[in-house]
Amino acid sequence: MSTKKHTKTHSTYAFESNTNSVAASQMRNALNKLADSSKLDDAARAKFENELDSFFTLFRRYLVEKSSRTTLEWDKIKSPNPDEVVKYEIISQQPENVSNLSKLAVLKLNGGLGTSMGCVGPKSVIEVREGNTFLDLSVRQIEYLNRQYDSDVPLLLMNSFNTDKDTEHLIKKYSANRIRIRSFNQSRFPRVYKDSLLPVPTEYDSPLDAWYPPGHGDLFESLHVSGELDALIAQGREILFVSNGDNLGATVDLKILNHMIETGAEYIMELTDKTRADVKGGTLISYDGQVRLLEVAQVPKEHIDEFKNIRKFTNFNTNNLWINLKAVKRLIESSNLEMEIIPNQKTITRDGHEINVLQLETACGAAIRHFDGAHGVVVPRSRFLPVKTCSDLLLVKSDLFRLEHGSLKLDPSRFGPNPLIKLGSHFKKVSGFNARIPHIPKIVELDHLTITGNVFLGKDVTLRGTVIIVCSDGHKIDIPNGSILENVVVTGNLQILEH
C-alpha cells in the first residue's frame, strides 16, 4: 500500500540499515548451517533449501518494512467502486453453464490442527454432523457434484507438516468414491527468536515447535513448487475455488463460476455482510485506484473503532476465493505476488522457560491487488458457516440445518440471522461439549444462548428466544429431559436425581 512514513534523522536510518544488514547476514549464515545439517537425498535437500530461501526472502522484507514503520494513509481509504464489489443477487440471474465445471478444481485449506477445540490431529477429522467429519462433508459435496453433472472436478488438500501424515492415511478410505483427491504440503518455515532474530531450529530434525506453516498466503508458492499448479493447467483447469476446511458453507457455486469466466476476472473474493460478531473481519477497500484487502492488524490504533463500524465497512472476507490458475503462474514466475506480512507472536518452552518467538505469515486474500479484474462478490451468509469453537459446533449439529449430499441447508422455517451462541470454558473442548450436551437441543426458534459453568443438558430440550444459563462455581445445573426454555435466565443450582 502506498503509505505515510514517519520522518527520521539520517543517523536513525543509518543505524537501522546497519542493524538490518547484520540481522539479514546472521540469518543467512544460520539458514546455510540449517541446510547443511540435513541428511537428505538430493531432491529432498533441494526442496528444503528452496523453503529456506523463500523464508529468507520473507524475513528480509520483514526487516525492511519494520524499519520503515509505514502506516496507511487513512484518508486515502475509500469504499470500493460499484464494479469492485458485485451483489450475488445480480449475478445469480444469469443462466448456469454446467460445462464450466470442466475448468474448475476445488482446494480446501487443511493445515490446521484441532487443538483449539481440544482435539489431537488435523481439525478436518473432527466429527461435525451425523458421523461425518469436515473432510467427509467436503468429499461428499464434490462427489455429489460430479455425479449430478457427470463432471470430474478434482479436490485438492493443502496440508501442513502438522496434518500431512494423518491426512494421507485418511484419504485412502475415499479411493472407491467418484472423486480425485490430491494432497500436497505447504512450506515449513523456521520460527525466529524475537530478541536475537535468529532461527529457532538448529537442524533439519529440530522439534516440531521450532517450525511453523506460514499462513495460507503460502498457497501460491506451494501449489507451484509441488507441481500441482502445472498439473492442473495441463488438465485444462483454469479456476481454483479455495476455502477454509472448516467453512461448511463453502460449496461450489455455478453462478459465481460462470460470472468469473464471463467477466474474465482473475480473482474473486466472496464477501458477506458484517454483523456485530464479525467486526474484526478483513474488508475490501479501494486504495490508490486498486482493490485491496484491509485487515484489522493494518489499521492504525486511532482508527480501530471506525474500522469496526459496520455502517462504514459493511462486509468482510469469507476466505472463499476463486483464482485463475494461469494468472497465478504468471505472477509467481515474474515474482510479483508479494502479500502483506503478518508477524505472529508465539511462545515456546525451552528448559522450563517460556521464550518469545515470531512467525512471519501471509494471507491469500491479500494477493487480490495483484490480479487483473479482481473484485468481490457479496454472497448470502449461508456461504459462511465456519466452525472455530464448540459454540459453532452446536449450531451446525442442530435442527437449524439438515444435511443434503454433504451440504448443510438451513431450515426454511427459520427467520432472521443465525442465533448467537456463547458456551463457557467447560464446553471449550469437544470432549467436554459431548459430555455436557450429549443430545443437541432444538434451536430453530432460538435467538441467543449463553451457558457458563457446570451445566448439563438433557434429552429433547427446546430453546427459544433468549436463554441464559449460569451455574456458580461449586454447583451444578441439570436441564431435565423434555424441557422447553423460552426467554429465561437459569442460575444457581439445579440437580435432577434419578429415582
Swiss-Prot record:
Its EC number is 2.7.7.9. InterPro entries: Nucleotide-diphossugar_trans, UDPGP_fam, UDPGP_trans. The active site is at residue 388. This is UTP--glucose-1-phosphate uridylyltransferase. The modification Phosphoserine is found at residues 17, 21, 79. Gene3D superfamilies: Hexapeptide repeat proteins (2.160.10.10), Spore Coat Polysaccharide Biosynthesis Protein SpsA, Chain A (3.90.550.10). GO terms for molecular function: metal ion binding; uridylyltransferase activity; UTP:glucose-1-phosphate uridylyltransferase activity. It comes from Saccharomyces cerevisiae (strain ATCC 204508 / S288c) (Baker's yeast). The modification N-acetylserine is found at residue 2. CDD domains: UGPase_euk. Homooctamer. Keywords: Acetylation, Magnesium, Metal-binding, Methylation, Nucleotidyltransferase, Phosphoprotein, Transferase. UTP binds at residues 109-112, 123, 186, 215, 246, 388.
